[in-house]
Amino acid sequence: MTIKEIQEEIVDEFSMFDDWMQRYEYMIDLGKSLPLIDEQYKTDDNIIKGCQSKVWVHADLEEDKLSFTADSDAIITKGIIAILIRAFSGQHPKDIIDADTSFIDEIGLKEHLSPTRANGLVSMIKQIKMYAIAYQTQLE
């Protein structure tokens, strides 16, 4: 699946819920199924700066595609990073770099987060794209 197709699938899933309480519960469930980062990668190098909670993200390049693992000490934040990893993991770095992230606005996520969590979301996206840039440079 392309990033766009995955994002559309996420938007469809979120549209099935009537209210934000149900969406938060769904995000918590997504966080529980997050591919967890190995303890050795829970370092300052992998921590997302600008997040209210602690969030670690690690990327590996496998057959020209990035795979991400992550963890957070907060359940909602864990769900947020799970959504991003679902959208971007298994994709080519160039596709991640070029990807539009407006699906976040389509599901209404930013407007239902506190300002510090919304800043954290932006920082998570930025870090994922920075990993993609770093690995794309290696591929060239």
Predicted regions and their residues:
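N-terminal intrinsically disordered, cationic/polar leader segments
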Residues: 3-54, 61-65, 104-140
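A generic alpha-helix surface/boundary motif
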Residues: 8, 78-79, 98
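Short small-residue beta-strand/loop micro-motif enriched in glycine and branched aliphatics
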Residues: 65-69, 78
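A short interface-forming secondary-structure element
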Residues: 72-74
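Alpha-helical support elements that line or immediately flank enzyme active sites
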Residues: 80-91
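Glycine-rich phosphate/pyrophosphate-binding loops
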Residues: 90-107
